[in-house]
UniProtKB/Swiss-Prot annotation:
<comment type="function">
    <text>Catalyzes an early step in the biosynthesis of tetrapyrroles. Binds two molecules of 5-aminolevulinate per subunit, each at a distinct site, and catalyzes their condensation to form porphobilinogen.</text>
</comment>
<keyword id="KW-0479">Metal-binding</keyword>
<dbReference type="Pfam" id="PF00490">
    <property type="entry name" value="ALAD"/>
</dbReference>
<feature type="binding site">
    <location>
        <position position="210"/>
    </location>
    <ligand>
        <name>5-aminolevulinate 1</name>
    </ligand>
</feature>
<protein>
    <recommendedName>
        <fullName>Delta-aminolevulinic acid dehydratase</fullName>
        <ecNumber>4.2.1.24</ecNumber>
    </recommendedName>
</protein>
<keyword id="KW-0350">Heme biosynthesis</keyword>
<keyword id="KW-0460">Magnesium</keyword>
<feature type="binding site">
    <location>
        <position position="238"/>
    </location>
    <ligand>
        <name>Mg(2+)</name>
    </ligand>
</feature>
<feature type="active site" description="Schiff-base intermediate with substrate">
    <location>
        <position position="200"/>
    </location>
</feature>
<keyword id="KW-0627">Porphyrin biosynthesis</keyword>
<dbReference type="GO" id="GO:0006782">
    <property type="term" value="P:protoporphyrinogen IX biosynthetic process"/>
</dbReference>
<feature type="binding site">
    <location>
        <position position="279"/>
    </location>
    <ligand>
        <name>5-aminolevulinate 2</name>
    </ligand>
</feature>
<comment type="pathway">
    <text>Porphyrin-containing compound metabolism; protoporphyrin-IX biosynthesis; coproporphyrinogen-III from 5-aminolevulinate: step 1/4.</text>
</comment>
<feature type="binding site">
    <location>
        <position position="222"/>
    </location>
    <ligand>
        <name>5-aminolevulinate 1</name>
    </ligand>
</feature>
<comment type="subunit">
    <text>Homooctamer.</text>
</comment>
<keyword id="KW-0456">Lyase</keyword>
<dbReference type="InterPro" id="IPR001731">
    <property type="entry name" value="ALAD"/>
</dbReference>
Length: 328
């Protein structure tokens, strides 16, 4: 086609893509290190780090090594972590979850002392703390709701007493946000926030995480309390209930497969929305990259940016450290 034969096009979107400078000027969404939360697994012992086999590049830390990791994270600009604990013992009543000298309580105190500016969020659920691997107490094969909520209240208060800035109930029991808010307020911890796993689906993407915490369910699945992946209206109901009960931040989990839920949540509710880039999503990228099928760094950054574009204000990701280095 000659110069004289050019199409009579008024609007040429490619003009704004011609150079990197132009593309950056008109970019609609930007990922920053401030968006990232690093999930951190702590285990008993001293001076030990274990790689999670199904999550290459992700590790379990003893508390002393977790402290060192947190110092490095903070130096990279990451301002928040979410703590998950592997207890020394599991009990049917889940009492280790609220032990003042439990794994999470010790970790909170040690990290807060060493890196006081770091925002410490803590997982509140019973799956690592009972032999059943379910998020609640179990009786005759049934996951108990109200009895579980009583334990979660104690667990949340114990985390607050240890110095947690936010508690993050991930259990999906009915009514637990209001009950935890009440327990925190009554124990003089009204400043401790709640990040609710409000729309948490019964997903197949959680497998490597359960390996990391040794918390796979020992019978059945979690579909009686986690959400059906087919549902979206139900997610809006769950989010609304948690906000009414006192959640400061709401989360959608998993991430990439549920960006529509993030979008609906952000459009409908005027609260910060978090998303969890879960272990299965992370492991798939790692596996494909190990085979040379994808560029891991580019896929990592694209995945995180897509979560931001969908409306997420906060991104929980095992890639937080790598992404922070890239964003510096």
């Amino acid at each position: 086609m000659s110069q004289l034969d050019l199409l009579n096009i008024v609007h040429r979107p490619r003009r704004l893509r011609r150079t990197a400078a132009l593309r950056n000027l008109v970019q609609e969404n930007t990922l920053t290190v401030n968006d990232l939360v690093f999930p951190l697994f702590v285990m008993p012992g001293t001076n030990a780090v274990e790689e999670v086999p199904s999550m290459p590049g992700s590790f379990r830390f003893t508390i002393d090594r977790a402290v060192e990791e947190c110092k490095e994270l903070y130096d990279l600009g990451i301002q928040a972590i979410d703590l998950f604990g592997i207890p020394e013992k599991k009990t049917e009543d889940g009492s280790e979850a609220y032990n003042d000298n439990g794994i999470l309580q010790q970790a909170i105190r040690a990290i807060k002392k060493a890196v006081p500016e770091l925002c410490i969020m803590t997982d509140v659920a019973l799956d690592p703390f009972t032999p059943f691997g379910h998020d609640g107490l179990v009786r005759d094969g049934i996951i108990l709701n109200d009895e579980t909520v009583e334990v979660l209240q104690k667990m949340a208060v114990s985390h607050a007493e240890a110095g947690a800035d936010f508690v993050s109930p991930s259990d999906m029991m009915d009514g637990r946000i209001g009950a935890i808010r009440e327990a925190l307020d009554e124990s003089d911890h009204s400043d401790v926030g709640i990040l609710s796993y409000a729309a948490k689906y019964a997903s197949s993407f959680y497998g490597p995480f359960r390996d990391a915490l040794h918390s796979a369910p020992q019978f059945g699945d979690k579909s009686t309390y986690q959400m059906n992946p087919a549902n979206t209206d139900e997610a809006m109901k769950e989010v609304e209930l948690d906000i009414i009960e006192g959640a400061d931040i709401v989360m959608v989990k998993p991430g990439l497969a549920y960006l529509d839920i993030v979008w609906r949540t952000k459009e409908r509710f005027d609260v910060p929305v978090a998303i969890y880039h879960v272990s299965g999503e992370y492991a798939m990228v790692k596996a494909a990259a190990a085979n040379g099928w994808i560029d891991e760094e580019r896929v990592m950054m694209e995945s995180l940016l897509c979560m931001k574009r969908a409306g997420a204000d906060i991104i929980f990701t095992y890639y937080a450290k790598e992404a922070a280095k890239k964003l510096r």
